[in-house]
């Protein structure tokens, strides 16, 4: 059977908070089967837990933030959540001594490296998948996102930026998920933003950790980063990375195909909520025979070494 996964050991990294600009320490701890993904703020006394849950996502303005009923939040979880999805981690406790996860280089790659450093341990409990049974679609003006039945996990994503630095041929990506392909083709794509927006936010005491080290930065005509892009379609690839993380806010891998046009964190979250609210749209399933596993969730082998 396909088994649940956790980490072999405790790992830690430090980075800078995107919004505060301050040093943040992140600690990942192994967890028992059926624990799920739990974010924990240890800077509060007592510590506050935020289980991965689409209903906890209450702010998607500048990042994905989990907010509890008392208004306590933990921000910028999306890239770490994408790395957890990419590595198939079902059970982990994520401790952070600040109100936000460190931004690192603006991609999921540092978190993938951290997970690989910890090592992956398979537990003797079946992994529970969310299998999509019928199409569900959410629209917002000309933006839309829908998820459909599919034996695997596929993302078909289109963006539409009218900008000289973003070629029209590089605004669509179809990605068939597997751990190897996520690490190789998706995890290194960085978030992006416009210099005018960053300057405005910093004038409002926000985005104080924003810099060329953690994002692709554009003005009205060009990319301002000296090293340019990591690959030609990095913009749409990062949107796919975001969607992988957003859909994993259920805490479970999905068997289905996401199709999206100009979607972002908010629409992705609305779609996930709509799916889970419709009992006829999905079902729990396990994969007892690994030979019958979709390629997306076959044993990653050397990735886990």
From Swiss-Prot:
One of its GO terms (molecular function) is metal ion binding. Zn(2+) binds at residues 79, 238, 242. One of its GO terms (biological process) is lipid A biosynthetic process. Pathway: Glycolipid biosynthesis; lipid IV(A) biosynthesis; lipid IV(A) from (3R)-3-hydroxytetradecanoyl-[acyl-carrier-protein] and UDP-N-acetyl-alpha-D-glucosamine: step 2/6. Belongs to the LpxC family. InterPro entries: Ribosomal_Su5_D2-typ_SF, UDP-acyl_GlcNac_deAcase, UDP-acyl_GlcNac_deAcase_C, UDP-acyl_N-AcGlcN_deAcase_N. GO terms for cellular component: membrane. Its cofactor is Zn(2+). Disulfide bonds: none annotated. Catalyzes the hydrolysis of UDP-3-O-myristoyl-N-acetylglucosamine to form UDP-3-O-myristoylglucosamine and acetate, the committed step in lipid A biosynthesis. It is an enzyme of class 3 (hydrolase). It comes from Aliivibrio fischeri (strain ATCC 700601 / ES114). The keyword Lipid biosynthesis applies. Its EC number is 3.5.1.108. The lineage of its organism: Bacteria, Pseudomonadati, Pseudomonadota, Gammaproteobacteria, Vibrionales. Coiled coil: none annotated. The keyword RNA-binding does not apply. This is UDP-3-O-acyl-N-acetylglucosamine deacetylase. It comes from the Bacteria. It catalyses: a UDP-3-O-[(3R)-3-hydroxyacyl]-N-acetyl-alpha-D-glucosamine + H2O = a UDP-3-O-[(3R)-3-hydroxyacyl]-alpha-D-glucosamine + acetate. The active site is at 265 (proton donor).
């Amino acid at each position: 059977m396909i088994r649940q996964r956790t980490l072999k050991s405790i790992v830690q990294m430090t980075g800078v908070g995107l919004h505060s600009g301050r040093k943040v320490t992140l600690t990942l701890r192994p967890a028992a089967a059926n624990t799920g993904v739990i974010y924990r703020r240890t800077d509060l006394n007592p510590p506050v837990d935020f289980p991965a849950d689409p209903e906890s996502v209450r702010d998607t303005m500048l990042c994905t933030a989990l907010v509890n009923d008392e208004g306590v939040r933990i921000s910028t979880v999306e890239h770490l959540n994408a790395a957890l999805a990419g590595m198939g981690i079902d059970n982990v406790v994520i401790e952070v001594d600040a109100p936000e996860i460190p931004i690192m280089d603006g991609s999921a790659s540092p978190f993938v490296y951290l997970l690989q450093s910890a090592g992956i341990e398979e537990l003797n409990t079946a992994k529970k998948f969310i299998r999509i049974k019928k199409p569900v679609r959410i629209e917002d003006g000309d933006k839309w996102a829908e998820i459909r039945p599919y034996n695997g996990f596929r993302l078909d994503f289109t963006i539409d930026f009218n900008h000289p630095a973003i070629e029209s041929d590089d605004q669509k990506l179809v990605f068939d998920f597997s751990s190897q392909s996520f690490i190789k083709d998706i995890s290194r794509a960085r978030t992006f933003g416009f210099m005018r927006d960053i300057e405005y936010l910093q004038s409002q005491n926000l985005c104080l950790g924003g810099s060329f080290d953690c994002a692709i930065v554009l003005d009205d005509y060009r990319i301002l980063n000296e090293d340019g892009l990591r690959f030609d379609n990095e913009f749409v690839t990062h949107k796919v990375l975001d969607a992988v993380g957003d859909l994993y806010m259920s805490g479970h891998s999905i068997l289905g195909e996401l199709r999206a046009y100009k979607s972002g964190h908010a629409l992705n979250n609305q779609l996930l909520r709509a799916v889970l609210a419709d009992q006829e749209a999905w079902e729990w399933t396990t994969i007892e025979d690994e030979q019958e596993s979709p390629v997306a969730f076959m044993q990653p082998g050397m990735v886990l070494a």
